[in-house]
Amino acid sequence: DRGTTALITYMRTDSVRIADEAQKAAADFIENRFGKDYLAPGGKRNFKTKSDAQDAHEAIRPVDVTLTPEDVKPYLAPDQYQVYRLIWARFVASQMAAARFHDTTVTIDNGPAQWRSKGERMLFPGFLAVMPRGKDEEGVELPALTKGETLKLNSLTKEQKFTQPSPRFTEASLVRELEELGIGRPSTYASI
Protein backbone atom coordinates (compact mmCIF):
# COMPACT_ATOMS: atom_id res chain seq x y z
CA ASP A 1 0.00 0.00 0.00
CA ARG A 2 1.55 3.30 -1.11
CA GLY A 3 -0.93 5.65 0.53
CA THR A 4 -1.94 8.65 -1.54
CA THR A 5 -0.07 8.80 -4.83
CA ALA A 6 -0.35 10.56 -8.17
CA LEU A 7 -1.30 8.27 -11.02
CA ILE A 8 -0.74 10.48 -14.07
CA THR A 9 1.56 13.30 -15.12
CA TYR A 10 0.41 16.90 -15.59
CA MET A 11 -2.79 16.69 -17.61
CA ARG A 12 -3.06 20.18 -19.12
CA THR A 13 -0.60 19.61 -21.93
CA ASP A 14 -0.77 18.76 -25.60
CA SER A 15 2.82 17.53 -25.77
CA VAL A 16 3.62 14.06 -27.10
CA ARG A 17 7.15 14.08 -25.68
CA ILE A 18 7.93 11.25 -23.25
CA ALA A 19 10.84 11.28 -20.81
CA ASP A 20 13.61 8.75 -21.48
CA GLU A 21 13.09 7.17 -18.04
CA ALA A 22 9.39 6.66 -18.79
CA GLN A 23 10.19 5.06 -22.15
CA LYS A 24 12.70 2.74 -20.46
CA ALA A 25 10.16 1.81 -17.76
CA ALA A 26 7.55 1.11 -20.45
CA ALA A 27 10.00 -1.03 -22.43
CA ASP A 28 10.89 -3.04 -19.32
CA PHE A 29 7.21 -3.51 -18.47
CA ILE A 30 6.31 -4.57 -22.03
CA GLU A 31 9.21 -7.01 -22.26
CA ASN A 32 8.39 -8.57 -18.87
CA ARG A 33 4.63 -8.76 -19.49
CA PHE A 34 4.49 -9.63 -23.22
CA GLY A 35 8.00 -10.52 -24.40
CA LYS A 36 10.65 -8.88 -26.61
CA ASP A 37 8.60 -9.26 -29.79
CA TYR A 38 6.12 -6.72 -28.44
CA LEU A 39 8.70 -3.96 -28.03
CA ALA A 40 8.70 -1.16 -30.59
CA PRO A 41 11.67 -1.32 -32.97
CA GLY A 42 14.66 0.10 -31.11
CA GLY A 43 12.82 -0.33 -27.80
CA LYS A 44 11.04 3.02 -27.93
CA ARG A 45 8.93 5.21 -30.17
CA ASN A 46 9.07 8.96 -30.47
CA PHE A 47 6.36 11.12 -31.98
CA LYS A 48 6.63 14.52 -33.60
CA THR A 49 5.29 17.41 -31.58
CA LYS A 50 2.98 19.82 -33.39
CA SER A 51 4.61 23.17 -34.07
CA ASP A 52 2.08 24.98 -31.88
CA ALA A 53 2.21 22.51 -28.98
CA GLN A 54 3.00 23.73 -25.48
CA ASP A 55 5.97 21.52 -24.74
CA ALA A 56 6.78 22.65 -21.19
CA HIS A 57 5.43 19.36 -19.82
CA GLU A 58 5.75 15.87 -21.22
CA ALA A 59 2.80 13.89 -22.55
CA ILE A 60 -0.01 12.73 -20.29
CA ARG A 61 1.03 9.28 -19.10
CA PRO A 62 0.99 7.06 -16.01
CA VAL A 63 3.52 8.11 -13.38
CA ASP A 64 4.29 4.42 -12.76
CA VAL A 65 3.56 2.14 -15.72
CA THR A 66 3.68 -0.93 -13.46
CA LEU A 67 0.52 0.30 -11.71
CA THR A 68 -1.92 -1.34 -14.10
CA PRO A 69 -5.55 -0.25 -14.26
CA GLU A 70 -6.57 -3.44 -12.46
CA ASP A 71 -4.12 -2.66 -9.62
CA VAL A 72 -5.71 0.73 -8.93
CA LYS A 73 -9.34 -0.08 -9.76
CA PRO A 74 -10.36 -0.76 -6.12
CA TYR A 75 -9.21 2.74 -5.14
CA LEU A 76 -10.89 4.72 -7.93
CA ALA A 77 -14.42 5.80 -8.79
CA PRO A 78 -15.68 4.17 -12.02
CA ASP A 79 -15.10 7.34 -14.09
CA GLN A 80 -11.60 7.77 -12.67
CA TYR A 81 -10.82 4.15 -13.44
CA GLN A 82 -11.99 4.52 -17.06
CA VAL A 83 -9.81 7.61 -17.57
CA TYR A 84 -6.77 5.94 -16.00
CA ARG A 85 -7.34 2.78 -18.03
CA LEU A 86 -7.41 4.82 -21.24
CA ILE A 87 -4.28 6.84 -20.37
CA TRP A 88 -2.39 3.74 -19.27
CA ALA A 89 -3.38 1.68 -22.33
CA ARG A 90 -2.61 4.50 -24.80
CA PHE A 91 0.79 5.08 -23.22
CA VAL A 92 1.78 1.42 -23.15
CA ALA A 93 0.41 0.84 -26.67
CA SER A 94 2.39 3.84 -27.94
CA GLN A 95 5.61 2.08 -26.95
CA MET A 96 4.73 -1.32 -28.44
CA ALA A 97 5.33 -2.89 -31.82
CA ALA A 98 2.73 -2.49 -34.53
CA ALA A 99 0.08 -5.14 -35.09
CA ARG A 100 0.52 -7.12 -38.30
CA PHE A 101 -2.25 -8.40 -40.54
CA HIS A 102 -2.57 -10.39 -43.74
CA ASP A 103 -5.10 -8.65 -45.98
CA THR A 104 -7.21 -10.77 -48.30
CA THR A 105 -9.51 -9.84 -51.16
CA VAL A 106 -11.84 -12.47 -52.57
CA THR A 107 -13.61 -11.97 -55.90
CA ILE A 108 -16.50 -14.31 -56.64
CA ASP A 109 -17.73 -14.53 -60.23
CA ASN A 110 -21.12 -15.95 -61.14
CA GLY A 111 -21.94 -15.28 -64.77
CA PRO A 112 -22.29 -11.52 -65.23
CA ALA A 113 -22.43 -10.88 -61.47
CA GLN A 114 -19.34 -10.30 -59.40
CA TRP A 115 -19.00 -10.00 -55.62
CA ARG A 116 -15.95 -8.82 -53.78
CA SER A 117 -15.14 -9.19 -50.13
CA LYS A 118 -12.15 -7.93 -48.19
CA GLY A 119 -10.89 -9.42 -44.99
CA GLU A 120 -7.87 -9.71 -42.80
CA ARG A 121 -6.19 -12.19 -40.53
CA MET A 122 -4.13 -11.03 -37.57
CA LEU A 123 -0.58 -12.33 -37.72
CA PHE A 124 0.72 -10.55 -34.61
CA PRO A 125 -1.32 -8.49 -32.12
CA GLY A 126 1.40 -5.99 -31.16
CA PHE A 127 -0.08 -2.96 -29.38
CA LEU A 128 -3.59 -4.41 -29.76
CA ALA A 129 -2.70 -6.70 -26.83
CA VAL A 130 -3.34 -3.72 -24.52
CA MET A 131 -5.62 -1.60 -26.67
CA PRO A 132 -7.99 -3.81 -28.69
CA ARG A 133 -9.82 -2.32 -31.63
CA GLY A 134 -13.44 -1.33 -31.22
CA LYS A 135 -16.19 -3.39 -32.83
CA ASP A 136 -16.52 -0.88 -35.68
CA GLU A 137 -12.77 -1.17 -36.43
CA GLU A 138 -12.52 -4.95 -36.50
CA GLY A 139 -11.87 -6.54 -39.83
CA VAL A 140 -13.67 -9.57 -41.19
CA GLU A 141 -11.72 -12.81 -41.23
CA LEU A 142 -12.47 -14.67 -44.45
CA PRO A 143 -12.35 -18.47 -44.66
CA ALA A 144 -9.50 -20.10 -46.57
CA LEU A 145 -10.46 -20.44 -50.23
CA THR A 146 -8.66 -21.75 -53.29
CA LYS A 147 -8.83 -20.33 -56.80
CA GLY A 148 -11.52 -22.05 -58.85
CA GLU A 149 -13.31 -23.44 -55.80
CA THR A 150 -17.08 -23.80 -56.20
CA LEU A 151 -19.05 -22.04 -53.50
CA LYS A 152 -22.58 -22.67 -52.30
CA LEU A 153 -24.88 -19.69 -51.77
CA ASN A 154 -26.56 -20.02 -48.38
CA SER A 155 -28.54 -16.80 -48.52
CA LEU A 156 -28.84 -13.60 -50.49
CA THR A 157 -30.13 -10.32 -49.13
CA LYS A 158 -31.05 -7.49 -51.44
CA GLU A 159 -30.41 -4.04 -49.98
CA GLN A 160 -30.89 -0.56 -51.30
CA LYS A 161 -28.52 2.02 -49.87
CA PHE A 162 -28.34 5.77 -50.24
CA THR A 163 -25.43 8.11 -49.79
CA GLN A 164 -25.55 10.16 -46.62
CA PRO A 165 -24.44 13.76 -46.13
CA SER A 166 -21.48 14.36 -43.86
CA PRO A 167 -22.57 14.16 -40.23
CA ARG A 168 -22.74 17.24 -38.05
CA PHE A 169 -19.91 17.85 -35.65
CA THR A 170 -19.88 15.81 -32.48
CA GLU A 171 -18.09 17.22 -29.46
CA ALA A 172 -15.08 15.00 -30.23
CA SER A 173 -14.97 15.83 -33.95
CA LEU A 174 -15.27 19.57 -33.22
CA VAL A 175 -12.37 19.44 -30.76
CA ARG A 176 -10.31 17.42 -33.28
CA GLU A 177 -11.02 20.00 -36.02
CA LEU A 178 -10.09 22.88 -33.69
CA GLU A 179 -6.82 21.11 -32.82
CA GLU A 180 -5.98 20.52 -36.49
CA LEU A 181 -6.63 24.19 -37.28
CA GLY A 182 -4.58 25.30 -34.27
CA ILE A 183 -7.51 27.13 -32.68
CA GLY A 184 -7.55 27.29 -28.88
CA ARG A 185 -5.70 25.16 -26.34
CA PRO A 186 -6.66 21.83 -24.76
CA SER A 187 -7.60 23.63 -21.54
CA THR A 188 -10.20 25.68 -23.44
CA TYR A 189 -11.80 22.65 -25.10
CA ALA A 190 -13.27 21.39 -21.81
CA SER A 191 -15.82 24.22 -21.88
CA ILE A 192 -17.16 23.16 -25.29
What are these regions (language model features)?
Residues 2-192:
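Core catalytic DNA strand-manipulation module of type IA topoisomerases
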